[in-house]
Amino acid sequence: MSSSGYPPNQGAFSTEQSHYPPHSVKYTFPSTHHQQDPAFGGKHEAPSSPILGQPCGDDQNASPSKLSKEELIECMDRVDREIAKVEQQILKLKKKQVKVFV
């Protein structure tokens, strides 16, 4: 174990590749709301985002340099979970779309 508590070549600053697959999603944040397609149902669930909703750490004005390593890791994990949720929602919507157009 290294002095950081992580085994060598592991941890937040590891040179190893992440165990998460790369994402090909491009994130855009339009200033206007798009009208929802009725073919996809009427309900829309906005994902909670640490960037938009809940700040990481106790201080809402905390910059990343003021957050502890553990807090940053928690934030990264939260973002990864949100990405996974959204990807699952996209897959479900694609399946619904295939059913509707077949």
UniProtKB/Swiss-Prot annotation:
Which Gene3D superfamilies does the record cross-reference, listed alphabetically?
1.20.5.430
Q: Key word Coiled coil present in the record?
A: yes
Question: What InterPro entries does its record include?
Answer: N-CoR_corepressor, N-CoR_GPS2_interact
Q: Where is the composition biased (Polar residues)?
A: 1-18
In this chain, the stretch annotated as Disordered covers 1-68
Tell me the first and last residues of the signal peptide: none
Signal: is it a keyword of this entry?
A: no
Recorded coiled-coil stretches: 68-100
Keyword list (alphabetical) reads:
Coiled coil
One family from Pfam that matches here is GPS2_interact
Q: Which family does it belong to?
A: Belongs to the N-CoR nuclear receptor corepressors family.
The protein's name is: Putative nuclear receptor corepressor 1-like protein NCOR1P1
Record organism:
Homo sapiens (Human)
The primary gene name is NCOR1P1
